[in-house]
Structures are given as structure tokens and as C-alpha cells.
Amino acid sequence: MIPVESRLPFYSAVDTSSRENGMATAIKDANQARDIKQPKALPAPNSDFYELAETLNPAERSLVKQVRAFTESKLAPVINRYWADDAFPFELLPALRELKIGGLGLEGYGCRGGSQKLFGFVMMELARIDPSFSTFFGVHDGLAMGSIYLDGSEEQKQKWLPQMARLEKIGCFGLTEPLVGSGAAGGLTTTAKREGDTWVLNGEKRWIGNAPWCDLSIIWARDLADNQVKGFIIENKTTPGFSVEKIERKIALKVVQNGHITLTNCRVPEANRLQAGNSFRDTARVLRMTRYMVGWMATGCQMGAYENALLYSQQRLQFGKPIGSFQLMQDLLAKMLANITACQCMLLRLAELDDEGKLTDQHAALSKGFCTARSRETVAWAREVFGGNGIVTDYNVARFFADAEALYSYEGTFQMQNLIVGKAITGFSAFV
């Protein structure tokens, strides 16, 4: 198995010198046996080709190095086993808590804070080893915490965000329904009816990440009184009428646990209604913030696939040579790196716009669509490098290949992203 480790100069979170030397020696010896000249040293995989990580300040770079150390020393050794078992690695939560990355991009309330650029780099690092683990964190930190941060009352923020920032309470985000995905803005079938100081919720939510085991759910429902979308905080384990069934037999994002939520006369106090979440526009504020984070995750997915493919090409011998020495293989690797670099540059600028308060729905939509589409290309080329070995998880690339398909679809399909952009640039709405 080829571990996913990159030795970028500023990262160098894990000492890989002995493994590098061993790989180079093995290739050299094999090639000398065939009387083939071999370079003294092979370049280490570097998926930050334009050194964009250098745009981070020293404190941010230090945190990203810590995240990489966690993913390479803790996550990488166990992820294939958990992925194969459709299970979540709860054993890693204590080490994840030690990183103190809860609440990235959110200020106050015990949150880590920091720039959206830093948040993006962290999401990219997590996805570089496993996109489904990064999805777990993105749902909690971006969607669940973001909903309370943007749409909650001061009291709700004080109550929930500190616990969530410490990863003591984990959240999920319930918008998608069995028959409602792209049409959520005007088509939610989950309803909310107010009865005094209580709301009665009925309906179903599907594909909800973290739902089978998390502590609280952000549920979006249509108010029967005014037909507007309202947001609610539901405490999963203590709310009657709330139930979750784990979705089984997934072929992608197998580590993040997705659930089918059923709400049957589920009674939620008014105190748990998101006080500033009174229409889908308020929901969209959260999605705007998190949607382009999927672009960072898709880019991390590409990075992991590319780095695995490059290492493999340097040590796999065919016709007496490393396959990385063949023109067709170098063409694939160069195209992969170009995709990654294009996505990184786009996302870096988008993070700057977000930090400046200039991020728009169309900005987020363009990046989400573009980066996830490029990810599908990149991981397909990476799998091609491995040949038959690319369809087993031992070599990691099969996970990236499968997960890229899910990233392409969730938080808004590619086609819906293009319609958002199309409306912005033409002035015409093509939505049905």
C-alpha cells in the first residue's frame, strides 16, 4: 500500500526520509539490474505547485501543519478499514479535539475563528486523506454551527457554540428530503405548526450527515402559517417524535454516517427556533458560506489522488522502467496537477472575497461546480495510473474515485450551480 504523504517544504509534519530513501534505493537497484540509468533522487509529491500555502501567516501555517500531522499519523493508518466497514472512527475524536479547530471562521463563543482561507486549507487537508472525514467536520463546523452563528439568537449562540467548538456536542443539518433536493427553496414538505410556545414538526429528511449519532440537528421546515422556511434546533436524544435510521449500502463517503430523519408530531420549544432563520434567504446565507467549502474538499480529494498516483508511478516498473518515465503517464500527471492548481487559485481568491464580505451566491456556485467537476477528472486519471490496482482500497485511490462522485452532487448539483451562475451573468432565470 502506498501511504498518502506529501513532503511540502513548509509542512514536513512527518519524518519520511527513511521511506523516501528506501523507495529510491529499491527503484535504483531494480533498474541497475536492467542496466538502466536512474536519477539520484526522485522529486517528492507536491500538490501545492504554486506554493499557495505561503499566503498563510505563520500561525495559520502552524495550524495546517498540525492538521496534516493528525491526518497522516492518526487518520491515514485506519481510514481504509473504517471506510470498508461503513463506520466512523470515534477513536480519533479525542485527538481531533486537541487540535482546537472547532468554529473555524466564526468569531467569539469559544470558536477558533480565523480567516475563511484558513478554514479552506484545513478542509482541504482533511479531504486530502479522506473526503468523508472532512464531510463529517464540514457538516458540523460549517452547516450546523454556521446555522446557529448566522441565524441563532444571542442566547442560542451562548448555549450551543462553545460546546460545539470543543466538539463536545456534534451537530447535523437537515434540509434535504426524500423527494426534495434542488427544489428546497420553495418545495419543502416538512412542516412546522406553532401551538403556543411549542412548534410541532412533521416530515422526513434524508442524506443528513452525522445524523445517526450526533447530539443536535438543525432542521428546516415550512411554517404552515406563512409558508416561510423556519429553522429549529432539535436535541436528538431527548426529543419525542424524532427518530433516525442510518442509510446503508453507500458506495461513497462511507465514513461519514448519513441518516434518514423522521419527525412525527415532534414538539420543539419556541426557545429552540432559530430566531433569525425566518425564510429560505436565511438558510441560503448558511449555504453560501459552506458551499464553496465543498470546493476546498474536492480539491483535497484531488490532491490525495494525485499524490498517491505520483508515488505509484515512481515505483511501479513496467518494460524495465518506472511507469512515471513514460510520456503518456506524465501527460496524465501534469493534467491532474493543472486541475488541482486551477482549483486552488480559484478558491484562494474566493476566500479573500469572503473575508472581505464580498462573497455572492454566484461566486460560491461557480467554484463548487468547477472544483467538483475537475475532481471527477483528476481522480479518474489517478485511478488510470494504477490500472487494476486502482479498484482496491489498499491503494487509496479507489476511495477518492468514489467520494468525488458524491462531492459532485451534494450541496447543490453541478447543473444547479450553473443555473445560479447563468442567472447572474445573463439576467434571466432559467429555474423551473
Task: Pin down the residues of each PLM region.
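Alpha-helical interface subdomain recognition
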Residues: 7-128, 139, 152-156, 163, ...
